[in-house]
């Protein structure tokens, strides 16, 4: 049956989620297939996606903790069952979900005797805890216990040099990897010149995002990585003249929008990516840092939201407006935009 589906060489490449489950609050699983692929393509896609899923997706972690009147991280605190080192390890395991950029502050301030869990962390509005039952420490006596925390969004495994912090602040080796594991396998089918491959992709995440969301973000990161190669450099133009110039994808915003306008249901704004807009590299990078990936994301923001983005200036706002006004129906702009 599968052989009949992929035998035709003219079939469109399609992907599908064939299994999705939640094993626990901190363990999500998803299984996907992509087909039909020509011989060798499944391995190429599988390797690229696996590396992007494990290394290119950002996560939010606790990166620093500040204790009061603690001489070193191996100290014990009277009235607390765990040592400072054990508390730091427990904080390292806390799974957070957010879209923040930069460093944010959080804190814990409780009175014993009681168990301290992730639910006791006082977080900024843009951050939430995936599993509030994660343990931190056990207060065995009626003492006041306070910790100042630092939260940061990053990617990969981040380490800091151990220093003698006089203020009681200790770095935490953060693992900013929402994807816990990725496996892929390849199934070949067909005969002779019509032989094709099916890619099976398995993704496990820590609950801060779903496997489907992780696959989407990894795919977008790969697309962004290859964007510079979609435009050949003009003959006789030096690299220095082109290094700061943004190069849009092959399908321009105008062409995509023209096709979308033919849809009677209206324009699917979540199908237009900001990569397809005629934006400067600086404006484009500002929007990407703020997790604005599609036109729907952009139109959902107010002017105040945009102006709060790091390095976003008034000229960026004007440039975005001019671009949208040029290509979008004016009634859509009036309904969607508040700036």
Swiss-Prot record:
Gene Ontology, cellular component aspect: chloroplast; DNA-directed RNA polymerase complex; mitochondrion
Catalytic activity: RNA(n) + a ribonucleoside 5'-triphosphate = RNA(n+1) + diphosphate
Enzyme Commission no: 2.7.7.6
InterPro entries, A to Z: DNA-dir_RNA_pol_insert (IPR011262), DNA-dir_RNA_pol_RpoA/D/Rpb3 (IPR011263), DNA-dir_RpoA (IPR011773), RBP11-like (IPR036603), RNAP_asu_C (IPR011260), RNApol_insert_sf (IPR036643)
Region described as Alpha C-terminal domain (alpha-CTD): 264-339
Major subcellular site: plastid
GO MF: DNA binding; DNA-directed RNA polymerase activity; protein dimerization activity
Top-rank lineage group of the source organism: Eukaryota
Top-level EC class: transferase
Keywords: Chloroplast, DNA-directed RNA polymerase, Nucleotidyltransferase, Plastid, Transcription, Transferase
Positions of the UniProt region annotated as Alpha N-terminal domain (alpha-NTD): 1-233
Localization terms from the record: Plastid, Chloroplast
GO biological process terms held by the UniProt record: DNA-templated transcription
NCBIfam families from the UniProt entry: rpoA
Function: DNA-dependent RNA polymerase catalyzes the transcription of DNA into RNA using the four ribonucleoside triphosphates as substrates.
Record's comment describing the protein's domains: The N-terminal domain is essential for RNAP assembly and basal transcription, whereas the C-terminal domain is involved in interaction with transcriptional regulators and with upstream promoter elements.
Subunit record text: In plastids the minimal PEP RNA polymerase catalytic core is composed of four subunits: alpha, beta, beta', and beta''. When a (nuclear-encoded) sigma factor is associated with the core the holoenzyme is formed, which can initiate transcription.
Family, as annotated: Belongs to the RNA polymerase alpha chain family.
Annotated protein name in UniProt: DNA-directed RNA polymerase subunit alpha
Source organism of this protein record: Elymus californicus
Gene that produces this protein: rpoA
């Amino acid at each position: 049956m599968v052989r009949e589906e992929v035998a035709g060489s003219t079939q469109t490449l399609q992907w599908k989620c064939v299994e999705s489950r939640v094993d626990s609050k901190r363990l999500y699983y998803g299984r996907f297939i992509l087909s039909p692929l020509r011989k060798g393509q499944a391995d190429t896609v599988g390797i690229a996606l696996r590396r992007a899923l494990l290394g290119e997706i950002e996560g939010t972690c606790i990166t620093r903790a500040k204790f009061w009147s603690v001489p070193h991280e191996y100290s014990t605190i009277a009235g607390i069952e765990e040592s400072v080192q054990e508390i730091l390890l427990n904080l390292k395991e806390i799974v957070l979900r957010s879209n923040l950029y930069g460093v944010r502050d959080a804190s814990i301030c409780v009175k014993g005797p009681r168990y301290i869990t992730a639910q006791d962390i006082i977080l900024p509005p843009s951050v939430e805890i995936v599993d509030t039952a994660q343990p931190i420490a056990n207060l065995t006596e009626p003492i006041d216990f306070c910790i100042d925390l630092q939260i940061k969004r990053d990617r990969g495994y981040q380490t800091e040099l151990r220093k003698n912090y006089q203020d009681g602040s200790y770095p935490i080796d953060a693992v900013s990897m929402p994807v816990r594991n990725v496996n892929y396998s390849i199934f070949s089918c067909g005969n002779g010149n019509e032989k094709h491959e099916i890619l099976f992709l398995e993704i496990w995440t820590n609950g801060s995002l779903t496997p489907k969301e992780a696959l989407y973000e990894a795919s977008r990161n790969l697309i962004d990585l290859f964007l510079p190669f979609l435009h050949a450099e003009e003959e006789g133009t030096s690299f220095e003249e082109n290094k700061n110039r943004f190069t849009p994808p092959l399908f321009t915003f105008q062409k995509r929008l023209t096709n979308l306008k033919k849809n009677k249901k209206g324009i699917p704004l979540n199908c237009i990516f900001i990569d397809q807009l005629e934006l400067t590299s600086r404006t484009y990078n500002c929007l990407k840092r703020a997790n604005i990936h599609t036109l729907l994301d952009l139109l959902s923001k107010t002017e105040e939201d945009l102006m709060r983005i790091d390095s976003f200036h008034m000229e960026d706002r004007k440039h975005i407006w001019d671009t949208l006004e040029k290509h979008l129906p004016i009634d859509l702009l009036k309904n969607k935009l508040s700036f």
